Amino acid sequence: MTEYLLSAGICMAIVSILLIGMAISNVSKGQYAKRFFFFATSCLVLTLVVVSSLSSSANASQTDNGVNRSGSEHPTVYSATSTKKLHKEPATLIKAIDGDTVKLMYKGQPMTFRLLLVDTPETKHPKKGVEKYGPEASAFTKKMVENAKKIEVEFDKGQRTDKYGRGLAYIYADGKMVNEALVRQGLAKVAYVYKPNNTHEQLLRKSEAQAKKEKLNIWSEDNADSGQ
């Protein structure tokens, strides 16, 4: 609509210029010609103001919401947190401690890692003792990391260690995320979700939902949702 009005304004400007030309050529013919000249000049000024306003409006409408009519987008500025990509770093296995804890050699130093966003049944808890499916979860993690030719750790966007000094990370064995594999097999639950350390939360919840549907391991028990 703006484009049509702009075109009409340009046509009006052209007509006004022609009228001014006619008035100038007849200005010597009397008072009527002078009034005609004044009228034509006023029309031209008014038309130029309208055309200028419409042109500005057209330019603004083309860039609404950061997208112009050609389809290209203006760069969007994001915070450092929202654009930060996770990356994997190499490590070597020292030993698997239990289902959700491993000890690795990381950057030349031994470090214990707690798997992010998951919780496996206990095997060494001073009060809970050995919980059902705890040994199975420990054996699963041990097999994955011991058989892997390449171990990698992937920190999330938030804090990297817990109050015990353990690294908080996603652990990969030959490219497969151990955290997700445990959840998919029904040997771990999605737990301890704290932003911004939750980049892979939806992946894990999807795997957990599938494990529940298939009633695998901890989800085969009647009290699976009791917080065990």
From Swiss-Prot:
It is found in: Secreted. Its cofactor is Ca(2+). Keywords: Calcium, Endonuclease, Hydrolase, Metal-binding, Nuclease, Secreted, Signal, Zymogen. GO terms for cellular component: extracellular region. It catalyses: Endonucleolytic cleavage to nucleoside 3'-phosphates and 3'-phosphooligonucleotide end-products. The active site is at residues 114, 122, 166. Residues 24-60 form a propeptide. Disulfide bonds: none annotated. Ca(2+) binds at residues 100, 119-120. Binds 1 Ca(2+) ion per subunit. SMART domains: SNc (SM00318). Residues 1-23 form the signal peptide. Gene3D superfamilies: 2.40.50.90. One of its GO terms (molecular function) is nucleic acid binding. It is an enzyme of class 3 (hydrolase). Belongs to the thermonuclease family. This is Thermonuclease. It comes from Staphylococcus aureus (strain MW2).
